[in-house]
C-alpha cells in the first residue's frame, strides 16, 4: 500500500495499531503509531527509512508490489533505531550493494544492531547534497541528540519537503495520513505527549537545530515525519510550537502525584489540592496516583506545570518505590524553571519527605517547604494540609492573588542553596488554630549529644557539622531546622538524646 505525498514522493510505511510500549516501558502509546518510510522516484529512486523489524517481511512484500527492488539507487537512513531501520537487514539481503546514506554515528549503531560492516555506507555531514535528477537534490542536516546521536534530517529541494525524522512527529495511528485530515485536539495532544516524554531533555538542542535549519532560508511546504501525521497544512505551525515548548514551557498548572500505603497520603493530596483552589481558582490542579495512572500522562502534566508536589508514605525510612521511579524519570527529563515540594504521611519516621525534597532539589527544581503528617490525618491535620495548599498557591502564583485566606506562617530563613529547606510537621493533636511548627527534639543541655535513630550517626555539639554551616559548640536546639543527617540525609526529627 502506498499513499501519494507530493509529485514523485509516496509513503510506503507501516501502521501499527496494537503497539503499546516504546523504548521498553519508557513510553506508553495510547493511539498506536506508524513507521513512516518514503519512496522518491525521480531520475534516481530513493528510499528514506524502513519500518520496525517486526514488519520487515510485510514491508518488503508491499515495496515489491510497487517497484523492482533493484531499481532503488540509494537508501537514506535518518535514524538507526529499530523502529526506523529495523527492516534494513531484510532489504539488504535483496539489494546488498545499495549505497546507504547516513551519519557516522548511524553507521556505528547500524553495524552494532545488524552486524554487517560490509554494507555500502556513505557517511554524510550537514550541508552535503545528493543529486537525484530532474533538477532536485537531497540536502542532509545532522541533528545529534534529537533524540539519538545518529539523528539527521533530509530536505528535498524542488518539492520543499523536510523529512524530519523523530522531530515534529507523534505516536499516533490513523488511516488518514495528513495533519489536516485528523482530529486536531488528538493530534496536538499526542505531539505534546511525545515532546514532553522524549525530547524535553534536549530542548536547548531543539531550539538551536530549528534556528540552524531556518537559517538556510529553505522553503518548507511539507514536513514528513518518521511517526504519525505528515504536516502539509501550515507545516511551520509545529516548528513554532516546538520553539515554545523548548523555551522553559509552563502553564498556570500545578501537578500533584503521590503513592500511599493506607490512603493517608492520598487524603493529604486532596486537602492540599483544595487549598490551592481556595486561593487561586484559576490555576489548573491535577492529582495523580502513580500506582493507578499512566506515568507518561503524569510526566506530560509535569511538563505543562509551573510547579509540582510529590507525596509518599514512608516505608523502610524511604519513599515508595514507584515515587522513586518517577523521580528518576523526572531527573532524566531535566525539567527547567519549575517549582516543587514534598509531602507525605508516616508512622514513626518521615524519611520519605526528606528524600523527595533532596531529589527534587538535585533535579533542578526550586523547592518549597515540605509537609509531613503523622498517621492518618484527622480533621485538624486536614485543615493544616489545606492551609499548606493555600500557602503554595500564593507562593507560586503567576500573578497577584486577590483571594484572602489565612495561611501557614512559615518563618523565612536564610538557607544555603545546597541544603534542604525545613519540613512542616502536622500532628493530629495540634489545634488547627495554632500555626504549624517544625518539630524538633530539643535539649536544654548545650553539650547533649544526639543520636540518629536510622543510621546511628551522632551529633556532637563540641564538633558541630561545618559542612552544613553548624559551628562547633552549637547546642542541638540551635542547630538549624534544615539540618540533615550527613549519613542518611534525614531530618532532625529522627534524632534522640544519647543516654
Swiss-Prot record:
Domain Flavodoxin-like: 254-393
Keyword match Iron: yes
Gene3D superfamilies given in the database record: 2.20.28.10, 3.40.50.360, Ribonuclease Z/Hydroxyacylglutathione hydrolase-like
Cofactor(s) for this UniProt protein: Fe cation; FMN
Cysteines joined through disulfide linkages: none
Location of this chain's protein in the cell: Cytoplasm
Stated family: In the N-terminal section; belongs to the zinc metallo-hydrolase group 3 family.
Name of the protein in question: Anaerobic nitric oxide reductase flavorubredoxin
The species this protein was found in: Aliivibrio salmonicida (strain LFI1238)
Lineage: Bacteria, Pseudomonadati, Pseudomonadota, Gammaproteobacteria, Vibrionales
Amino acid at each position: 500500500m502506498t499513499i501519494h505525498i507530493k509529485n514523485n514522493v509516496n509513503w510506503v510505511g507501516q501502521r501499527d495499531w496494537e503497539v503499546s510500549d516504546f523504548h521498553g516501558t519508557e513510553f506508553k502509546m495510547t493511539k498506536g503509531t506508524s513507521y513512516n518510510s518514503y519512496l522518491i522516484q525521480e531520475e534516481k529512486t530513493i528510499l528514506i527509512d524502513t519500518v520496525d523489524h517486526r514488519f520487515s517481511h510485510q514491508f518488503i512484500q508491499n515495496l515489491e508490489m510497487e517497484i523492482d527492488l533493484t531499481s532503488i539507487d540509494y537508501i537514506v537512513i535518518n535514524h538507526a533505531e529499530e523502529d526506523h531501520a529495523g527492516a534494513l537487514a531484510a532489504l539488504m539481503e535483496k539489494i546488498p550493494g545499495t549505497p546507504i546514506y547516513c551519519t557516522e554515528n548511524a553507521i556505528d549503531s547500524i553495524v552494532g544492531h545488524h552486524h554487517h560492516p560490509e554494507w555500502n555506507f556513505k557517511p554524510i555531514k550537514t550541508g552535503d547534497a545528493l543529486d537525484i535528477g530532474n533538477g532536485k537534490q537531497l540536502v542532509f542536516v545532522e541533528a545529534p541528540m534529537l533524540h539519538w546521536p545518529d539523528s539527521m534530517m533530509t530536505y528535498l529541494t524542488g518539492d520543499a519537503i523536510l523529512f524530519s525524522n523523530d522531530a515534529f512527529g507523534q505516536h499516533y495511528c490513523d488511516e488518514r495520513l495528513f495533519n489536516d485530515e485528523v482530529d486536531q485536539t488528538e493530534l496536538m495532544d499526542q505531539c505534546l505527549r511525545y515532546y514532553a516524554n522524549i525530547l524535553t531533555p534536549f530542548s536547548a538542542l531543539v531550539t538551536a537545530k530549528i534556528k540552524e535549519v531556518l537559517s538556510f532560508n529553505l522553503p518548507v511546504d511539507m514536513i514528513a515525519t518518521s511517526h504519525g501525521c505528515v504536516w502539509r497544512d501550515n507545516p511551520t505551525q509545529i516548528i513554532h510550537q516546538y520553539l515554545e515548548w523548548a523555551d522553559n514551557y509552563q502553564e498556570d498548572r500545578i501537578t500533584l502525584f503521590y503513592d500511599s500505603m493506607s490512603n493517608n497520603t492520598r487524603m493529604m493530596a486532596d486537602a492540599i489540592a483544595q487549598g490551592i483552589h481556595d486561593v487561586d481558582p484559576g490555576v489548573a490542579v491535577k492529582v495523580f496516583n502513580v500506582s493507578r495512572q499512566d506515568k507518561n500522562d503524569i510526566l506530560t502534566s509535569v511538563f505543562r506545570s509551573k510547579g509540582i508536589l510529590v507525596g509518599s508514605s514512608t516505608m523502610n525510612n524511604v519513599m515508595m518505590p514507584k515515587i522513586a521511579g518517577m523521580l528518576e524519570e523526572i531527573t532524566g527529563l531535566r525539567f527547567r524553571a519549575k517549582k516543587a515540594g514534598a509531602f507525605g504521611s508516616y508512622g514513626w519516621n518521615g524519611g520519605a519527605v526528606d528524600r523527595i525534597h533532596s531529589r527534587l532539589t538535585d533535579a533542578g527544581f526550586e523547592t518549597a517547604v515540605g509537609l509531613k503528617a503523622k498517621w492518618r490525618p484527622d480533621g485538624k491535620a486536614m485543615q493544616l494540609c489545606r492551609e499548606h495548599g493555600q500557602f503554595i498557591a500564593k507562593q507560586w502564583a503567576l500573578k497577584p492573588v486577590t483571594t484572602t485566606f489565612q495561611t501557614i506562617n512559615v518563618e523565612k530563613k536564610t538557607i544555603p542553596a545546597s541544603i534542604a529547606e525545613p519540613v512542616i510537621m502536622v500532628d493530629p493533636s495540634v489545634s488547627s488554630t495554632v500555626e504549624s511548627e517544625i518539630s524538633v527534639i530539643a535539649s536544654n543541655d548545650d553539650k547533649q549529644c544526639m543520636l540518629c535513630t536510622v543510621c546511628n550517626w551522632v551529633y556532637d555539639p563540641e564538633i558541630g557539622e561545618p559542612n552544613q554551616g553548624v559551628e562547633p559548640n552549637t547546642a542541638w536546639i540551635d542547630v538549624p531546622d534544615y539540618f540533615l543527617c550527613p549519613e542518611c540525609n534525614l531530618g532532625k526529627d529522627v534524632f534522640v538524646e544519647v543516654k
